[in-house]
Amino acid sequence: MDLNHLNLRVRDAVACREFYERHFRFRLAFEAEGGFFVRNDAGFLLALVPAVRHQPLPTGFHIGFRLDRPDDVTALRSSLDRDGVGTGPLEDSRPHEDYVTFRCWDPDGTEIEVFWDGS
């Protein structure tokens, strides 16, 4: 069984679509419900649908992207910083020594963890 999709209700579907396409290699799959459905190379579908009334996500909710190498994590963080995207500090050795991570936020404020875990 595979996790297939995530539906995010967002304030600005266009800005979120551009963010995920530019920084996380998603591509438009189709448009519906006034929003965008974008897919990555692994086949995961992210639905970015306009919210009628915005409700903040629960504390601790985040999306995680695992990258292939620790250098990929630092390169993406640098790219996001250059583009003015807010990022948290680069951390390593948490929860074990084969772990490198940072946090950032999409245009709607959804927290994203980018990491490499040695697997």
Per-region residue spans from a language model:
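Short aromatic/hydrophobic contact patches that present stacked aromatics
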Residues: 5-7, 37, 62-64, 101-103
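N-terminal beta-strand motif that seeds the catalytic metal site of vicinal oxygen chelate
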Residues: 1-15, 63, 118-119
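Amphipathic alpha-helical segments
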Residues: 12-27
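Short, conserved charged micro-motifs
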Residues: 15, 70-75
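Vicinal oxygen chelate
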Residues: 77, 82-119
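Conserved short beta-strand elements that form part of the metal-binding/catalytic scaffold
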Residues: 27-59, 111-116
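Short glycine-enriched loop/turn motifs at secondary-structure junctions
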Residues: 1-2, 56-60, 96
